[in-house]
Swiss-Prot record:
<comment type="subunit">
    <text>Heterodimer of LeuC and LeuD.</text>
</comment>
<protein>
    <recommendedName>
        <fullName>3-isopropylmalate dehydratase large subunit</fullName>
        <ecNumber>4.2.1.33</ecNumber>
    </recommendedName>
</protein>
<comment type="similarity">
    <text>Belongs to the aconitase/IPM isomerase family. LeuC type 1 subfamily.</text>
</comment>
<feature type="binding site">
    <location>
        <position position="417"/>
    </location>
    <ligand>
        <name>[4Fe-4S] cluster</name>
    </ligand>
</feature>
<keyword id="KW-0432">Leucine biosynthesis</keyword>
<keyword id="KW-0411">Iron-sulfur</keyword>
<keyword id="KW-0456">Lyase</keyword>
<dbReference type="GO" id="GO:0003861">
    <property type="term" value="F:3-isopropylmalate dehydratase activity"/>
</dbReference>
<keyword id="KW-0408">Iron</keyword>
<dbReference type="InterPro" id="IPR015931">
    <property type="entry name" value="Acnase/IPM_dHydase_lsu_aba_1/3"/>
</dbReference>
<keyword id="KW-0004">4Fe-4S</keyword>
<dbReference type="InterPro" id="IPR050067">
    <property type="entry name" value="IPM_dehydratase_rel_enz"/>
</dbReference>
<comment type="function">
    <text>Catalyzes the isomerization between 2-isopropylmalate and 3-isopropylmalate, via the formation of 2-isopropylmaleate.</text>
</comment>
<dbReference type="GO" id="GO:0051539">
    <property type="term" value="F:4 iron, 4 sulfur cluster binding"/>
</dbReference>
<dbReference type="InterPro" id="IPR001030">
    <property type="entry name" value="Acoase/IPM_deHydtase_lsu_aba"/>
</dbReference>
<feature type="binding site">
    <location>
        <position position="414"/>
    </location>
    <ligand>
        <name>[4Fe-4S] cluster</name>
    </ligand>
</feature>
<comment type="pathway">
    <text>Amino-acid biosynthesis; L-leucine biosynthesis; L-leucine from 3-methyl-2-oxobutanoate: step 2/4.</text>
</comment>
């Protein structure tokens, strides 16, 4: 029998038929919807006189456009000041009501960012194919699932047929062996990977993360890593199923029960790459070599360790790369050879589908406890990824830690990850952000984004500039997974 990778196994389990042109019809187990990429898809169903093929395979929640202050949320839909944003959230409510799709509406305790809500509800399960009209759907691959983002026309296609046409990708394995040093996290792993292979390194590949450092990561940490596979150029990121995966899923609302659970676990336990499976590309890193990472430029691959300096374009021989560095330095308002620790900040954002889970908040709170946000920081936001994460954090007293330190404690949503809601950067402002993208204008027109882990973001907030979180001593305990 031919040895298979995890991706091979998931593909074979869901391939309905193979076409003459080399593409395949793939069955989709779970479809997650939000307010931005679904309106036209639902309208397409109406115009064609169709209904969703499998209503129970879909769940929905608004996240991109929702406001995050308590006052705005208490005001309901009318409190959404932007007309387009308000219409999109309202339209999602109406579409889900009309078609009978389960939606966690804006003020439902279960509402949150789609890539946080799916796993915590058990709607994401090992062995599934999972799609959503959002590129960071790769997050769900942390569960040994085949998960990727789709466009609006594909959202309609999945609603109507529960299938998609796709071509099989190549296999890439990223192996991270060893033990992470104190103060180094899952976010640092994935930023280091992107720094090594670049934002095109995974093009055309399904990327499996493996190795002892990945196995040691929590499910939250694995979700962080798979979340940013797309920034490494791969549409799909995944981690093999193990006992941590199964323990996380057990007992969640959508998880199988009783005999169905036992049968599911038996299948899930096979969702690992065979020992002699072939990977088209293998990338290796040593965990011990990874330090806390900070992005300095306008692409996720423009990332350095905290103890390094911003690059000098004059030292770059490749003219294309030299021009890219020069443009990034100009946009970011930085100078060649500037120490990363000399980058001063205006705002701090802890949240997003990358880093807004309970372990992320615990890690940031461990650093913030007993400290104060620096007087030079205009705003430091903490935005939980869901209402359930928020409730758990409050039960643990994390909200009080943040509030005492001078952070703002918000309601769940995508928030400052992207400029589609009231939480935005002003032009020229530097932000330490736990999100996943640092393109020009991503967090607001002219805004300057630096990608970091939650612990590094909290350390920057209390310092006013980037610092090595490892130098803050025992406060860094427990930050490894985030």
């Amino acid at each position: 029998m031919t040895a298979k990778t995890l991706y091979d196994k998931l593909w074979d389990l869901h391939e309905v038929t193979r076409r003459d042109d080399g593409s395949s019809l793939i069955y989709i187990d779970r479809h997650i919807l939000h307010e931005v990429t679904s309106p036209q898809a639902f309208e397409g169903l109406r115009l064609a006189g169709r209904k969703p093929w499998r209503i129970d395979a879909n769940i929905a929640t608004p996240d991109h456009n929702v406001p995050t202050t308590r006052a705005e949320r208490q005001g309901g839909l009318e409190s959404i000041s932007d007309e387009v944003s308000r219409l999109q959230v309202q339209t999602l409510d109406e579409n889900c009501d009309d078609f009978g799709i389960l939606e966690f509406k804006m003020n439902d305790t279960r509402q949150g960012i789609v890539h946080v809500v799916g796993p915590e509800q058990g709607a994401t399960l090992p062995g599934m194919t999972v799609v959503c009209g959002d590129s960071h759907t790769s997050t769900h691959g942390a569960f040994g699932a085949l998960a990727h983002g789709i466009g609006t026309s594909e959202v309609e296609h999945v609603l109507a047929t529960q299938c998609l046409i796709a071509k099989k990708m190549k296999n890439m394995q990223v192996r991270v062996e060893g033990t992470l040093p104190f103060g180094v996290t899952a976010k640092d792993i994935v930023l280091a990977v992107i720094g090594k292979i670049g934002t095109a390194g995974g093009n055309g590949h399904a990327l499996e993360f493996a190795g002892s450092a990945i196995r040691a990561a929590s499910m939250e940490g694995r979700m962080t890593i798979c979340n940013m596979a797309i920034e490494a150029g791969a549409r799909v990121g995944m981690v093999a199923v193990d006992e941590k995966t199964i323990a996380y899923v057990k007992g969640r609302p959508f998880a199988p029960k009783g005999a169905h659970w036992d049968a599911a676990v038996a299948l899930w336990s096979t969702l690992v790459s065979d020992p002699d499976a072939h990977f088209d590309t293998v990338v290796e890193l040593r965990a011990e070599d990874i330090k806390p990472q900070v992005s300095w430029g306008t692409s996720p691959e423009m990332v350095l360790a905290i103890d390094q300096h911003v690059p000098d374009p004059a030292a770059e021989q490749d003219p294309t790369k030299r021009d890219s560095i020069e443009r990034a330095l100009k946009y970011m308002g930085l100078t060649a050879n500037q120490p990363i620790t000399a980058i001063r900040l205006d705002r701090v954002f802890i949240g997003s589908c990358t880093n807004s889970r309970i372990e992320d908040l615990r890690a940031a709170a461990a650093v913030a406890k007993g400290r104060k946000v620096a007087s030079t920081i205009k705003q430091a936001l903490v935005v939980p990824g869901s209402g359930l994460v928020k409730a758990q954090a409050e039960a643990e007293g994390l909200d009080k830690v943040f509030l005492d330190a001078g952070f703002e404690w918000r309601e769940p949503g995508c928030s400052m990850c992207l400029a589609m809601n009231p939480d935005k950067l002003g032009s020229g402002e530097h932000c330490a952000s736990t999100s996943n993208r640092n393109f020009e204008g991503r967090q607001g027109a002219g805004g300057r984004t630096h990608l970091v882990s939650p612990a590094m973001a909290a350390a920057a907030a209390v310092s006013g500039h980037f610092v090595d979180v490892r130098e803050l001593g025992d406060s860094g305990v427990g930050i490894r997974d985030s």
